[in-house]
Amino acid sequence: MPKMKTHRGAAKRFKVLKSGKVKRSKAYKSHLLTHKNAKRKRRLRKATYLVGGDAKNIRRLLPYS
């Protein structure tokens, strides 16, 4: 059986931790930031985790992580 390929788009966006959780960064933080207040931009800096079926799907795309 051939090697499974890693989905490169998913590899750039997600990180699978030792615990099995899938870490991701938040959207809406790249441009058009002048009208967003400081509190909102500060909250967007923090990473968050995928839950349930979403995490399972991403883990399937990243077989060697």
Swiss-Prot record:
Any one cellular-component term (Gene Ontology): cytosolic large ribosomal subunit
Keywords, comma-separated and alphabetical: Ribonucleoprotein, Ribosomal protein
Entry similarity comment: Belongs to the bacterial ribosomal protein bL35 family.
Protein name: Large ribosomal subunit protein bL35
The keyword Chloroplast is annotated on this UniProt entry: no
PROSITE patterns attached to this UniProt entry: RIBOSOMAL_L35
Cystine pairs: none
Gene (name only): rpmI
GO BP term, example: translation
InterPro entries to which the protein is assigned, alphabetical: Ribosomal_bL35, Ribosomal_bL35-like, Ribosomal_bL35_CS, Ribosomal_bL35_sf
Recorded GO MF terms: structural constituent of ribosome
Organism placement in taxonomy: Bacteria, Bacillati, Bacillota, Clostridia, Thermoanaerobacterales
